[in-house]
Amino acid sequence: VNNVYVRQGGVWKGFGITTVLNITINTFNYDIFVEAGSPVAAVDVVINIANGIKVGSTTTATPAMYGSANLPTGSTVVINNLGKIQGKGGDANAGTGGVALQLVATTTIDNTAGNIWGGGGGGGEGGQSRLNIADDEEPASYVYVNGGAGGGGAGLNGGTGCNVGTVTSGGAGCAGAIYQTVIGGAGGLGGAPGTNGSLGGAGSFTPNSPGGIAGKAVNLNTFTPVWTGGNNATQVRGLVS
């Protein structure tokens, strides 16, 4: 007999079955549901992230660690994190940062020696300026001077922009274009891990644009985590909600 299931309180649960998942190499978009074997009955899952290992994401639309489906009702997850779980940085011009961890069951998190960081938001675009180049007696004729692009937000995969975000910091925005005495607004700085991107600089014609919203450190997804360590503003950056 490979698996034994017992019905408890109307829920089928694996009896004495614990699925242990060891992450020992850097990985992206880790799907807990798939890695646990796409279970059809409740299961207990233990995820061990080795020291220094990074779990990231290739897109802000998908968390670094998540589930393509929630685990069956009654399941539990334990995450022992000695590495880093980090969402992708948001792209320039107000791109939203990615989520680091999305819960798929009732979860216990030991983050004592690890980090869980949401992706930084992308920096805002600089505002546009303009210059009237017509003579005093002629109808107005404008030259428009564009603002600079914002920087990418921080992430294991940094957001793209004038400067790409790094793991620990957002990328700098570009300076605005210059025409004669007129300068477009500068692009805003990409957000640090779990931090919104900065406003772009205002132009004389259009205002500055806001920075992007940071990704969550943990998307609760209706579940409530139990933290056994490492739940502080340094090791968990971004909202837990």
Model regions and ranges:
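Exposed regions on extracellular, virion, or secretory-pathway luminal proteins
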Residues: 11, 38-40, 72-75, 210-211, ...
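Beta-solenoid repeat scaffold
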Residues: 69-82
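N-terminal segments that cap or nucleate solenoid repeat domains
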Residues: 17-64, 225-232
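Intrinsic disorder/low-complexity segments enriched in polar/small residues
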Residues: 9-10, 36, 138-139
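Glycine-rich, low-complexity segments
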Residues: 8-20
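Glycine-centric low-complexity/flexibility signal
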Residues: 45-46, 50-63, 82-222, 233-241
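Extracellular disulfide-bonded cysteine-rich modules/repeats
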Residues: 2-7
